[in-house]
Amino acid sequence: MPTSIKAIKESLEAVTSLLDPLFQELATDTRSGVQKALKSRQKAIQADLAEEERLEAMLSYEKALYKEGYQAIAGIDEVGRGPLAGPVVAACVILPQHCKIKGLNDSKKIPKAKHETIYQAVKEKALAIGIGIIDNQLIDEVNIYEATKLAMLEAIKQLEGQLTQPDYLLIDAMTLDIAISQQSILKGDANSLSIAAASIVAKVTRDQMMANYDRIFPGYGFAKNAGYGTKEHLQELKAYGITPIHRKSFEPVKSMCCDSTNP
């Protein structure tokens, strides 16, 4: 067994089980540096085990469908139903069977600093990805609920021509008029790994779009607020008026449009 604290730390990094004999051997080492390293590694392993258990639980819908004979399960989710500006974006993602991506969760639960890393991990592992984007003008024409459906259908359509085609859809709280077997799951982005994958793809895609809009329409804070009605956003609306990407069917934008047409 290594004796220097540095060597012990290196040995601990290779340990992946809480039952590893090295833990018992080091338990009698009275050096504070060793005990600190020991506890740190045990804590890290416990966190990894908890994450593995969480990811396994989020595959429950997929595993049941694999047993029924389905091969390519697509998760579908959207981002951007609530903002005052910008599009609604949906993603359709097919992951390999039993695929687990550390940290993948409902995009609202993932720290923003980790969005890009997990997004890239999904892109690398996914068998197929489709993205549907419905702009603010069509949202105003058909309403946000119907626009969300259109975005999801477009995301599925984007899979055409890719090697893997979905034979089952897991959808976050929505039912689609399409000839593919499907299941609507309430809070699906927190309960299905496939839907969670779609959630982060849609989130990062939309955030990138809003960052671009921030450069085109500076002053509204689109890169920061993503078009949502924050206090600062509402203040800028009052000061500068609406932009071409604001949703005229959403309040208070709707009232501002009406006010501007009245003498």
Swiss-Prot record:
Cofactor note: Manganese or magnesium. Binds 1 divalent metal ion per monomer in the absence of substrate. May bind a second metal ion after substrate binding.
Biological process (GO), any one: mismatch repair
Residues annotated as domain RNase H type-2: 71-262
GO CC annotation terms, alphabetical: cytoplasm; ribonuclease H2 complex
E.C. number(s) listed in UniProt: 3.1.26.4
Domain of life: Bacteria
UniProt keyword terms in alphabetical order: Cytoplasm, Endonuclease, Hydrolase, Manganese, Metal-binding, Nuclease
InterPro entries per record: RNase_HII, RNase_HII/HIII, RNase_HII/HIII_dom, RNaseH-like_sf, RNaseH_sf
Annotated catalysed reactions: Endonucleolytic cleavage to 5'-phosphomonoester
Subcellular location field: Cytoplasm
Annotated CDD domains: RNase_HII_bacteria_HII_like
Cofactor: Mn(2+); Mg(2+)
Any one GO molecular-function label of the UniProt entry: manganese ion binding
Enzyme class (EC, first level): hydrolase
Main subcellular localisation: cytoplasm
Residues that hold a divalent metal cation according to the record: 77-78, 172
Homology family: Belongs to the RNase HII family.
Main function: Endonuclease that specifically degrades the RNA of RNA-DNA hybrids.
Protein name, per record: Ribonuclease HII
Organism: Streptococcus pyogenes serotype M3 (strain ATCC BAA-595 / MGAS315)
Gene giving rise to this polypeptide: rnhB
